[in-house]
């Protein structure tokens, strides 16, 4: 009988502990788990136990045994991350603009003892602290900075909450601003400001585009002129090189002709052949003078071909008086010998010209 009674009592205690753990933890005394001697604490929860009205210990997750009548579960704290909606409130910025702003608060209980005995309602206390801190931080910023520095504002609110909530055993993980509502007039002025800023930006971009276009056109003209001047320079250099090559080639050809002529003059009857050539060229050049309509100078007796030939021979004779030093003796020795034959041949040539 005693064994059956013990088993029945154990079953009742186990059933009571399971029912207590299934209920949601609340601060009201009616919602707290009862002391059934054997208790099972759920994961991520901390049960604060008082013995005879004083703090005794904190029950960890798992199996726990309490003394009936003496021990009492006074608080149940959740160690999970808690999400709290901060109600919408009004705040005044540094430039005297009234805003309606709300947010979301993420916190976690780090010390169940401080959360139980440090403050009456930790969640409500943190919510009120978040609202007051948010109003204080918004008063330090202008309206433009509130929108631009939203992340830094959230970080400042988190730091301020953690400094004040440390004695409550609560840590604020993050704070996020949800909505910021501005007055209608301020909203209209902000729209006008945005439109003006856009027009200004469009004007600046258009002017920059015009400037860049002008710079590109000028740069293109500059490059074109540089390339044209370089091309002209290269053309002049090539033309000069071609002319120099032509002059050099002509000079070489003339020098070769002179060398061949000099070599021919040193041969037998070279003077006679040279005299005949000079006479022919003189007569030919004189006969071409009448073909041009230019003012010319005629000899004193243009009808006398003999005098013309004699004059040409005189010119050649004057040229042959200053021969090359090496060939001077040979030319002078042959000149006396060939004069008669040269004169005779010239006379015959002149007679044929007269008869024709």
Curated annotation (Swiss-Prot):
Coiled-coil stretches noted in the UniProt entry, renumbered to this chain: 215-252
GO terms, biological process: CD4-positive, alpha-beta T cell activation; intracellular calcium ion homeostasis; lipid localization; mitochondrial protein processing; mitochondrion organization; positive regulation of interleukin-2 production; protein complex oligomerization; stress-induced mitochondrial fusion
N6-succinyllysine modifications at: 145
Renumbered residue ranges of the record's region Disordered: 326-356
UniProt GO molecular function: cardiolipin binding; T cell receptor binding
InterPro entries per record: Band7/mec-2_domain, Band_7, Band_7/SPFH_dom_sf, STML2-like_C, Stomatin_HflK_fam
Span of the transit peptide along the chain: 1-28
Record's keyword terms, sorted: Acetylation, Cell membrane, Coiled coil, Cytoplasm, Cytoskeleton, Lipid-binding, Lipoprotein, Membrane, Mitochondrion, Mitochondrion inner membrane, Phosphoprotein, Transit peptide
Entry-linked Pfam families: Band_7, Band_7_C
Gene3D superfamilies: Band 7 domain
Compartments, as annotated in UniProt: Cell membrane; Mitochondrion; Mitochondrion inner membrane; Mitochondrion intermembrane space
Assembly and binders: Forms homooligomers. Interacts with MFN2; may form heterooligomers with this mediator of mitochondrial fusion. Interacts with PHB1 and PHB2; stabilizes and recruits them to cardiolipin-enriched mitochondrial membranes. Interacts with CACNA2D2.
Protein name according to UniProt: Stomatin-like protein 2, mitochondrial
The organism of origin for this protein: Bos taurus
Gene transcribed to yield this protein: STOML2
């Amino acid at each position: 009988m005693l064994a059956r009674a013990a088993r029945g009592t154990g079953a009742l205690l186990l059933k009571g502990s399971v029912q207590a753990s299934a209920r949601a933890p609340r601060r009201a005394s009616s919602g707290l788990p009862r002391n059934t001697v054997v208790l099972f604490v759920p994961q991520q929860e901390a049960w604060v136990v008082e013995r005879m009205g004083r703090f005794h210990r904190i029950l960890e997750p798992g199996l726990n045994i309490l003394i009936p009548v003496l021990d009492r579960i006074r608080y149940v704290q959740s160690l999970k991350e808690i999400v709290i909606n901060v109600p919408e409130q009004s705040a005044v910025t540094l430039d005297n603009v009234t805003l309606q702003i709300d947010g979301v608060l993420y916190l976690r209980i780090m010390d169940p003892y401080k959360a139980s005995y440090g403050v009456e309602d930790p969640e409500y206390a943190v919510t009120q602290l978040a609202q007051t801190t948010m109003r204080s931080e918004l008063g330090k910023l202008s309206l433009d900075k509130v929108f631009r520095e939203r992340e830094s504002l959230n970080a400042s609110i988190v730091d301020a909450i953690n400094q004040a909530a440390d004695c409550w055993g609560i840590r604020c993980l993050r704070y996020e601003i949800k909505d910021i509502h501005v007055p209608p007039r301020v909203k209209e002025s902000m729209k006008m400001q945005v439109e003006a800023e856009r027009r200004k930006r469009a004007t600046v971009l258009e002017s920059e585009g015009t400037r860049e276009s002008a710079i590109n056109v000028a740069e293109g003209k500059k490059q074109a002129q540089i390339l044209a001047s370089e091309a002209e320079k290269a053309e002049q250099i090539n033309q000069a090189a071609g002319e120099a090559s032509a002059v050099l080639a002509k000079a070489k050809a003339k020098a070769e002709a002179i060398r061949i002529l000099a070599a021919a003059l040193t041969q037998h009857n070279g003077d006679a052949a040279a005299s005949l050539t000079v006479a022919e060229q003189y007569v030919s050049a004189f006969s071409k003078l009448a073909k041009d309509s230019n003012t010319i100078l005629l000899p004193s007796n243009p009808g006398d071909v003999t005098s013309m030939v004699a004059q040409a021979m005189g010119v050649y004779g004057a040229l042959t008086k200053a021969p090359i030093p090496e060939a001077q003796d040979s030319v002078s020795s042959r000149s006396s010998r060939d004069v008669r034959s040269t004169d005779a041949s010239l006379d015959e040539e002149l007679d044929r010209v007269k008869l024709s």
